[in-house]
């Protein structure tokens, strides 16, 4: 969905947007030092699945844990200035000299100051499924404007996902990445960042 586990070289663990069972995907048990929540919808703020008494960064709050720094910029969950679904926090992480951007439930093309803040990320996780968020075309527009090295699509239909959203295929097609094979984990280091689109396996697959 939009939940990722990021592990720094020193072992610090960050979990983003933990979801609940309404999504239809198996809900994992996780342990973390820091949890970030892009907005207060139940498929993005289920802190009960995260053990370890983590620090929690909600909305646009900055945080620093175990050498990992995170800040956020505010945008919207829809294309009407938040009138339909409220605000969305785009989270920027600085991990081991890498810039990692998690777009949350982005619902529109961000304003120019927001685009500048997320420019040239090493890794960007971006929703592509539409309906609740931007779709494949909207995601590509943001990618083209901000030029991340590695793009990880999220928030799309999988076999057991109960939401009325599109699968990842339209995004892969529009990005020229139809042959991308899902991977369970991804190792990223400064100077060694996989370029292009990387598809992660959903939790339902393992």
Task: Annotate each predicted stretch with a short phrase.
Residues 39, 128, 154-156:
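Short secondary-structure boundary segments
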Residues 13-17, 69-75, 92, 99-105, ...:
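Active-site-proximal beta-strand elements of phosphoester/diester hydrolases
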Residues 45-97, 176-194:
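Metallo-beta-lactamase
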Residues 32-33, 122, 149:
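Conserved acidic residues
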Residues 84-85, 150-206:
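Binuclear metal-ion centers of metallo-dependent hydrolases, dominated by the metallo-beta-lactamase
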Residues 5-40, 44-60, 74-88, 106-117:
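Pre-active-site segment of Zn-dependent metallo-hydrolases
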Residues 79-146, 163:
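Active-site-proximal loop/helix segments of hydrolase catalytic cores
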Residues 1-3, 88-90, 197:
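Short hydrophobic/aromatic beta-strand or adjacent loop that forms the aromatic wall/cage
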């Amino acid at each position: 969905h939009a939940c990722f586990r990021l592990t720094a070289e020193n072992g610090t663990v960050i979990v983003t947007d933990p979801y609940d069972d309404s999504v239809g995907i198996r809900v994992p048990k996780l342990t973390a030092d820091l949890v970030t929540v892009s907005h207060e919808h139940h498929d993005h703020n289920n802190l009960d699945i995260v053990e370890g008494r983590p620090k929690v960064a909600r909305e646009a709050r900055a945080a620093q844990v175990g050498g990992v720094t995170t800040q956020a910029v505010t945008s919207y969950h829809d294309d009407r200035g938040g009138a339909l679904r409220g605000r969305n926090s785009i989270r920027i992480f600085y991990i081991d000299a890498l810039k990692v951007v998690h777009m949350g439930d982005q619902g529109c093309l961000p304003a120019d100051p927001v685009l500048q803040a997320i420019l040239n990320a090493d890794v960007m996780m971006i929703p592509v499924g539409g309906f609740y968020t931007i779709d494949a075309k909207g995601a590509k527009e943001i990618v083209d404007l901000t030029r991340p090295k590695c793009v990880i699509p999220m928030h799309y239909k999988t076999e057991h996902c109960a939401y009325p959203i599109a699968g990842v295929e339209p995004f892969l097609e529009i990005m020229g990445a139809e042959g991308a094979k899902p991977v369970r984990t991804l190792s990223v280091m400064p100077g060694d960042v996989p370029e292009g689109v990387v598809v992660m396996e959903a939790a339902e697959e393992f």
